[in-house]
Amino acid sequence: MAKIAKTHEDIEAQIREIQGKKAALDEAQGVGLDSTGYYDQEIYGGSDSRFAGYVTSIAATELEDDDDDYSSSTSLLGQKKPGYHAPVALLNDIPQSTEQYDPFAEHRPPKIADREDEYKKHRRTMIISPERLDPFADGGKTPDPKMNARTYMDVMREQHLTKEEREIRQQLAEKAKAGELKVVNGAAASQPPSKRKRRWDQTADQTPGATPKKLSSWDQAETPGHTPSLRWDETPGRAKGSETPGATPGSKIWDPTPSHTPAGAATPGRGDTPGHATPGHGGATSSARKNRWDETPKTERDTPGHGSGWAETPRTDRGGDSIGETPTPGASKRKSRWDETPASQMGGSTPVLTPGKTPIGTPAMNMATPTPGHIMSMTPEQLQAWRWEREIDERNRPLSDEELDAMFPEGYKVLPPPAGYVPIRTPARKLTATPTPLGGMTGFHMQTEDRTMKSVNDQPSGNLPFLKPDDIQYFDKLLVDVDESTLSPEEQKERKIMKLLLKIKNGTPPMRKAALRQITDKAREFGAGPLFNQILPLLMSPTLEDQERHLLVKVIDRILYKLDDLVRPYVHKILVVIEPLLIDEDYYARVEGREIISNLAKAAGLATMISTMRPDIDNMDEYVRNTTARAFAVVASALGIPSLLPFLKAVCKSKKSWQARHTGIKIVQQIAILMGCAILPHLRSLVEIIEHGLVDEQQKVRTISALAIAALAEAATPYGIESFDSVLKPLWKGIRQHRGKGLAAFLKAIGYLIPLMDAEYANYYTREVMLILIREFQSPDEEMKKIVLKVVKQCCGTDGVEANYIKTEILPPFFKHFWQHRMALDRRNYRQLVDTTVELANKVGAAEIISRIVDDLKDEAEQYRKMVMETIEKIMGNLGAADIDHKLEEQLIDGILYAFQEQTTEDSVMLNGFGTVVNALGKRVKPYLPQICGTVLWRLNNKSAKVRQQAADLISRTAVVMKTCQEEKLMGHLGVVLYEYLGEEYPEVLGSILGALKAIVNVIGMHKMTPPIKDLLPRLTPILKNRHEKVQENCIDLVGRIADRGAEYVSAREWMRICFELLELLKAHKKAIRRATVNTFGYIAKAIGPHDVLATLLNNLKVQERQNRVCTTVAIAIVAETCSPFTVLPALMNEYRVPELNVQNGVLKSLSFLFEYIGEMGKDYIYAVTPLLEDALMDRDLVHRQTASAVVQHMSLGVYGFGCEDSLNHLLNYVWPNVFETSPHVIQAVMGALEGLRVAIGPCRMLQYCLQGLFHPARKVRDVYWKIYNSIYIGSQDALIAHYPRIYNDDKNTYIRYDLDYIL
């Protein structure tokens, strides 16, 4: 529009032009009536579809219904719906928390299952086996055939079948891989199972009488690469066709009768987990589009195995489902989320394949309708799911004739079906899915809220601890209130054990203690079966915590002692649960496991242990073999190696299976690791048993044999080389023939044998083996590197190897291949490399090694610098700096200064290294001290607290060297700088500054110290209030040092002020702080006199806190020792008159420590304190008598031989009546006093007191007197001879020993 229209024609033309342009506009640019408006996308976001997030159709078949329902589906109108929310930029700024974030997760006690790796999770697939037969029961009678216990023969047969089955599976898998499996018969996929029992070695195509079904061209087109469905060719546990309810795989919808599929391995093997059928593996590829509404359901299944979903149409066969089956992840069939079982459906990880009567939780959890009693043991999610399921089942219930009559008017009748009509039995799904309906109403009714479930009690009644949701499946019977008198004896026993176990697992310590004592005392009464059937499933629980496991293991330990031989039928059960503890990462769990298996072996005996564990030795599962080997080693240590040797010999020479040989040799290895030098008497026998394994045809057996030899040699070090003569040759051949893991094991064995040899042999073997080691230096395998380093260290540590040989042959390739950045990253490699390098330095000298690595102190990788520094520190710590020349010394100081300044991590490697190097160089450091101090002062000003702390720590490491170099002026300057930094706010840094001041005070002395002590100490007094342990410890050490050496520089008033501050430090948790504090009281008392300090301390006896009072009594005793007892005793004895329990006990405690510390000086004070002790020993309060007995003990031991027997005899008359006390603390103190008196007044007097009660008619009296007599006898056996009472000769016997009457 160049110009404005003025005339009528121009205006008309302009209007026409605009209208033309408008008409030409693309229709799509307009806004439709039902479409959305244009919004600012950056404000409102832009979800295009108004139906986004909704499912727009329900698929007719499961195949169409994908799992990714939540992706943006195409809407009905193909348009998007705008979202209204905060601006995107703002949302991006808000940190989005991860889904289901649990704020309490880090404070929750960790579960054992959470930290297990894949290998250790095997333990949960183990089955707690049924009881075994005890051949030794009833004196070895023939067992009753009615007993269901499995014999050794049954177990071995089962093991054999499992092994055979696994081998056939492997062969089939290999054939399938190689494409050698051929179609034997076109109908192999749909062949019905044979009626008679099939033999293990008979394949499916040999079954007679199977009528083949012709495949239609449709089916053949759908199943390319058709393979026969052999019995072994199937993944166990899941029958084909059970994915869709009742569907027959590969069948068309018009097929009139469902065809059967072979019933897989209906019984999975011991280690097999039930899972889905492998897709396409058995020729059962389902048709492309199946309509599940038209399919004919199967009312009976050959193999149960479809987890019931709560929201599906009910089926008649719901009750027959496999209990607790867990679907295999990544299964062959994509399931619709509408048919999915809720995630929380019950199914514990505790194996559910348990045969026999071993309880495994509540089976009814997984059934469609639990009985009312089981409802209580569900978790809230399961309860909710069950409610929904029940409601849907109730609605879909078929109507009865009576209900139909009530609904329809009269005149209707039921039509008979036409002749020959075969119904499609889809409505069969709508038959009741609830075998035990819980009495629901029929027809229409007002839906009142169901309150019954809300009142379900999820906590046991009575005095029982809180029940966690995880425990409900084990303790559900306690939730049901029953009259126990109506129960059978077995049920009563079961409830009793349940209650005790719940108290032990979840109760308070007193409750736990009582329950543990009760279950131990009644163990034989309860019986082994009921006890283990409840304890062992608890130990297999996937939600068990460390503390709970510890307590349950303690229960087993206690009851094993009581049950003794009754435990035999349950040995395998216990081992299945306890063996995994032997490979636990927690050391204490491993020790507990060993303890249990050791006690079990002693209770059950060797024969039972061997017959029980023998089948597991050649188990196909490596996990079982590994844990069995470790358990056997524990049995050997418990019952002695000789008793197990014949068995081990047989196992290691087994011809049938290499697994048995492998496990037998592993047992020998584990025995060596477990028992150490205790194997020496049996070393030759053990070596002979396993030597043939070094030339076995199986690679794994050869490897474990070499590792076992290495373990035996390590345990025998430095003895026993002659026992290994027979294995040297095969080992020697082995290291030339093997590569990889085998070679690593053989090298390890040689490495442990060389240190046992004489020097000349060691030298020869080292030179020979070194060629192979140097070749393996460049191996990329981490395990090989560790072993090579270890062997180099062992070879170079032996006497026969010369330094020259190491310098020329080993060091160049060693540094080339090992001193690399990668080695510093792995902790185990790092440690091994440092140790090996230090060992090489011990042979060739410090300078040779340090000169090769000193430049690496300036490397850019910090972890590598740390490795270099640690090596230098250890070498110089061992060898000093004598052979380090001036040039190397400069490089070293320069390097460590650089490394120290560049460090960023918070460990002490650099600090320790710096300190060690500087101290090793000694006076040679003087030229570098200004540079070092400059660096330290600069870093004390750094804004980073960590840097300041390291600088202060470095001063305390180098103070001694500064003194050696006579740099007192420099130290004085440092002291002033540190004094100025006492206002530091970070406690870690303040602690280091105090430590540095303490180091300077120690070396420079009190009189030369700057700042002067009179200025320094008042500055320290307020710091004593700091509650940080590091600050407290360093501060009290510094104050104590000043009080000891420079007390005269500070006024008495300041020391008293410090005394009051010190009382607070007696509350410290750390023992070192309390010890330093009580010692400081002694120094202060020495400086300013005992009276003021003593007054402060005596007042502190009145406090409530026990730890505080005990420390105060120790301080009083130290003051007495420092300032002579006569300055303290009058005030102390006067304080005893205060009629307060704590004060009197404190005084007695002080006297106890006082007499312990002053020893023989006590002879001057014994008569003074006797009246006080008389009173205390007659007091009603037990603690008074206990403490007074302790005083008598220390006093009598101190004054032995100083002629104070009269007073001590007087005190003995007061101590003696307390011998009948039952309190363990009191009786311990009384026995201690009697021991002390035995030394001081002689065993004769004690024997005279003792003889009165040795033959007393009352047993309790005799017990006490014999206990006292035994202790006198142990202490003074020879001295008693002269004091036994005279018994005169009679007609038959001569009792008098005349030679004892001779007097010269």
UniProtKB/Swiss-Prot annotation:
Modified residues (Phosphoserine): 129, 194, 229, 287, 322, 332, 344, 349, 400, 488
Listed GO MF terms: chromatin binding; mRNA binding
Residue numbers carrying N6-acetyllysine: 141, 214, 554, 562
Gene Ontology terms: biological process: anterior/posterior pattern specification; blastocyst formation; chromatin remodeling; mRNA splicing, via spliceosome; positive regulation of transcription by RNA polymerase I; positive regulation of transcription by RNA polymerase II; positive regulation of transcription by RNA polymerase III; spliceosomal complex assembly
Modified residues (Citrulline): 157
HEAT repeats: 529-568, 569-603, 604-641, 643-677, 680-718, 763-801, 843-881, 1010-1048, 1052-1090, 1122-1160, 1163-1201
Region feature Interaction with PPP1R8, mapped onto this chain: 223-491
UniProt site positions, description: Interaction with SF3B3: 602, 677, 1205
Tissue: Ubiquitous.
Biased composition (Polar residues): 342-352
Annotated stretches, region: Interaction with PHF5A: 547-550, 1156-1157
Keyword line: Acetylation, Citrullination, Isopeptide bond, mRNA processing, mRNA splicing, Nucleus, Phosphoprotein, Repeat, RNA-binding, Spliceosome, Ubl conjugation
Stretches the record annotates as Interaction with SF3B3 and SF3B5: 1248-1304
Function: Component of the 17S U2 SnRNP complex of the spliceosome, a large ribonucleoprotein complex that removes introns from transcribed pre-mRNAs. The 17S U2 SnRNP complex (1) directly participates in early spliceosome assembly and (2) mediates recognition of the intron branch site during pre-mRNA splicing by promoting the selection of the pre-mRNA branch-site adenosine, the nucleophile for the first step of splicing.
Family: Belongs to the SF3B1 family.
Name recorded for this polypeptide: Splicing factor 3B subunit 1
